Every structure is written in C-alpha cells, then in structure tokens.
C-alpha cells in the first residue's frame, strides 16, 4: 500500500473577515495477494480524492458567519469497476451571541464520502462460525446532507450544550454480515 496526501491553502484577511482558498488531494494505491475462504486472488485498487474549496469567515457585532463552497472528486478504480463522482460541498455556519454566556449556532453542510478500502475489497472475512462479511467493489460514494442547531450555556459550574440535528444520506455506507454454511475455516 502506498499513499500520498497534499494540500495547498491560502488565507487572506480583510477588514471584517478572512477568505480561505485551497486544494487537497489524497491518493492511495493498494496491491494485495488475497488468500481467504474463497481461495487465492490478486487485487489492485486505486483511491483518489480531490477537494477544491473556498470559504469566507467573518463577524458583525454578535453575529458570526462562515460560508464555504467546494467541489469534491472521488475516483475509485479496481479491476471490476471505475467510479468517478463529482459533488458540490457547500457549508454554512451562522452563530449569534445571546448573552455573555449563551449562544446559538446553526450549521448546514453537504459532503461526499468514499467507501473505505475494506468495503470495496472482494475479500471475505469470517467473523464467527458461519457469519461472514465481504466488500462490494460496486459501492458508490455516500452523500451526506447535515443540519445542526446548537444552544450553548456556560458558567463557572457547568456547561450545557443542546443539539438538534437532521441528517439525510444517499448511498448510505454500512457494514453487513451474512450467513454462509458452505465455507470452512
């Protein structure tokens, strides 16, 4: 397994806020000789994720804000399939100081998340007798839309944070197990 991660970022301050610009890239290449319950095989895969973004952060009296927009590219390539997914990645954070020790914060974001290497691998794993998990090389990246509203209160004795949230998923990624009585350890 070999991997590389890189990021270039620039921040420019204005009178009332800051502008951030950047580009992040990560690439992982994996070459495996698999020996598992189904036999032996060779498996090569490459995971590439790129993220281009800009964000503006500022404060006006008791009101704070952060507005960001980005573009995420997930490119996964294996012997079975090649997937190329482009997704916008907007982000909005609004905050308001209610009093010296109280605040409200709203955040909203949309992002794309690649399946992990074990989720995409055709490898099969015996968890307990007759119960196995296996990857799926045809999985698509998950898209997550999340909204949060947070109330915070603090004093010398305790901190109270209350969070209300809603999350929506497309192509939800989860681990699954199945019963197989045809496999021997």
Question: Which residue ranges define each predicted feature?
Answer:
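Outer-membrane beta-barrel signature, preferentially recognizing the C-terminal barrel domain
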Residues: 112-161, 168, 185
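An acidic- and aromatic-residue-enriched active-site/binding cleft used to recognize and process polar
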Residues: 70-72, 109-113
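Transmembrane beta-barrel architecture of outer-membrane proteins
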Residues: 2-7, 47-53, 87-91, 134, ...
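Face-selective signature of the C-terminal outer-membrane beta-barrel domain
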Residues: 1-81, 97, 158-166
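Outer-membrane beta-barrel translocator domains and adjoining extracellular loop/strand segments
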Residues: 1, 31-40, 77-88, 117-125, ...
């Amino acid at each position: 397994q070999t991997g590389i991660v890189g990021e270039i970022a620039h921040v420019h301050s204005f009178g009332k806020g800051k502008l951030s610009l950047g580009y992040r890239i990560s690439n992982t290449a994996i070459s495996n000789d698999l020996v598992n319950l189904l036999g032996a095989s060779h498996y090569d895969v490459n995971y590439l994720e790129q993220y281009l973004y800009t964000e503006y952060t500022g404060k006006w009296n008791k009101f704070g804000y952060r507005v960001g927009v980005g573009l995420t590219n997930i490119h996964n390539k294996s012997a079975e399939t090649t997937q190329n997914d482009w997704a916008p990645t907007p982000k909005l954070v609004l905050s308001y100081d209610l009093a010296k020790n109280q605040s409200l914060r709203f955040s909203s974001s949309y992002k794309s998340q690649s399946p992990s290497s074990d989720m995409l691998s055709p490898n099969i794993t015996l968890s307990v007798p007759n119960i196995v998990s296996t990857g799926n090389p045809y999985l698509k990246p998950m898209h997550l839309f999340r909204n949060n509203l947070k109330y915070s209160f603090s004093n010398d004795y305790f901190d109270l944070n209350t969070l209300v949230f809603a999350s929506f998923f497309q192509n939800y990624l989860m681990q699954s197990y199945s019963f197989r009585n045809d496999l021997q350890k």
